[in-house]
């Protein structure tokens, strides 16, 4: 039967308007390391792998393998996948490890195979499943590692792809922390026949998708070997995304060169340091602080709205929580001002 077209929109897909605060702000090309110009060793230190996790190992095991393969000290993944589940698993490396926090508000997408325990007409299946869009209440499954408290989660969209007998293949976009196994169980209850999850694959984690950046562990081993043994870095470089990829979806504040070193040395972002910003920022929002070369400086909590940042001349605009840029990429311009 024909299916209605579903608008598959996650929070990561929101388009934002850029507001100019200082139209005269410029950046010095001699300072910093834009993502596309980082040497390969630096690219690794500030990189994220869009990994196609195979079914079988745990997410923790996969990260441990990557650390061993690439001889790394630190790495972290952006959202656990159960051992049997395959698909998109962003793995942040070394100094970019903490950037996975930025993926929490971005939303995730899965393709799941649901098996019904009884016969149900196709139109009823589609109708009932659409009723699960919006806010739902879940309790984590028994096998979950987290406490089994009731929690509210958002289902952004459900799209039925195929129905064959009692098997239903569907795509679903959800808030981070949503349990698809529990969702399927409750769909089965609503249909009056019961249901369980047969297969599950994650197809998106915010800005990370099933696209040309998605690589397997086998690819990673091969590309690393080409670089280390043959000196061919092209494939290995493409296998690792800059950490800036992980904040594509966040509201951003771009800062002047003169403010960069202050932030990297622990200062919160003050209004005079802002060159431009995204519209729609609300107090409390997680925002990415960027240079005018689109380098990630830090993540922080907005202390003002976009309009306040635009109109005010002083005050703290962003409470800086995590700094990613090294302190020596931009000069301490405030020291020059102090000496002059």
From Swiss-Prot:
Q: Name the EC number(s).
A: 5.4.99.25
Q: Which UniProt keywords apply?
A: Isomerase, tRNA processing
Q: What is this protein called?
A: Probable tRNA pseudouridine synthase B
The answer to whether the entry has keyword Lyase is no
Q: Which GO terms fall under molecular function for this chain's record?
A: RNA binding; tRNA pseudouridine(55) synthase activity
EC primary class? isomerase
Report the CDD domains cross-referenced here. PseudoU_synth_hDyskerin, PUA_Cbf5
The residues annotated as the active site are 82
The family line of this record is: Belongs to the pseudouridine synthase TruB family. Type 2 subfamily.
Annotated GO biological process: box H/ACA sno(s)RNA 3'-end processing; mRNA pseudouridine synthesis; rRNA pseudouridine synthesis; snRNA pseudouridine synthesis; tRNA pseudouridine synthesis
């Amino acid at each position: 039967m024909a299916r209605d077209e579903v608008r598959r929109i996650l929070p990561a897909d929101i388009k934002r308007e850029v507001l100019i605060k200082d139209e005269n702000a410029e950046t010095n090309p001699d300072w910093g390391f834009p993502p596309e110009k980082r040497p390969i060793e630096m690219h690794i230190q500030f990189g994220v792998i869009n990994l196609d996790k195979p079914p079988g190992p745990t997410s923790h095991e996969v990260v441990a393998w990557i650390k061993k393969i690439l001889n790394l000290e630190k790495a972290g993944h952006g959202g656990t996948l159960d051992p049997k589940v395959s698909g998109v698993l962003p793995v942040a490396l070394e100094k970019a490890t903490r950037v996975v926090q930025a993926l929490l508000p971005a939303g995730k997408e899965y393709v799941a195979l649901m098996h019904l325990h009884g016969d149900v007409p196709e139109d009823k299946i589609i109708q009932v499943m659409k009723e699960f869009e919006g806010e739902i209440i879940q309790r984590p499954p028994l096998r979950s590692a987290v406490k089994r408290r009731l929690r509210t989660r958002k289902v952004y969209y459900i799209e039925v792809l195929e129905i064959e007998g009692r098997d239903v293949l569907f795509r679903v976009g959800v808030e981070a922390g949503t349990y698809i196994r529990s969702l399927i169980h409750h769909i089965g209850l609503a249909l009056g026949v019961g249901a369980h999850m047969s297969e599950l694959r994650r197809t998106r984690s915010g800005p990370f998708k099933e696209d040309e950046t998605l690589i397997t562990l086998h690819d990673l081993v091969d590309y690393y070997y080409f670089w280390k043994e043959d000196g061919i870095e092209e494939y290995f470089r493409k296998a690792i995304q800059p950490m800036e990829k992980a904040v594509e979806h966040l509201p951003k504040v771009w800062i002047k060169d003169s403010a960069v070193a202050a932030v990297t040395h622990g200062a919160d972002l003050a209004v005079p340091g802002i060159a431009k910003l995204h519209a729609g920022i609300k107090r409390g929002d997680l925002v990415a602080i960027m240079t005018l070369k689109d380098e990630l400086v830090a993540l922080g909590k907005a202390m003002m709205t976009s309009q306040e940042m635009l109109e005010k001349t002083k005050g703290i605009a962003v409470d800086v929580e995590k700094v990613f840029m090294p302190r020596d990429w931009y000069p301490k311009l405030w020291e020059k001002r102090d000496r002059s």
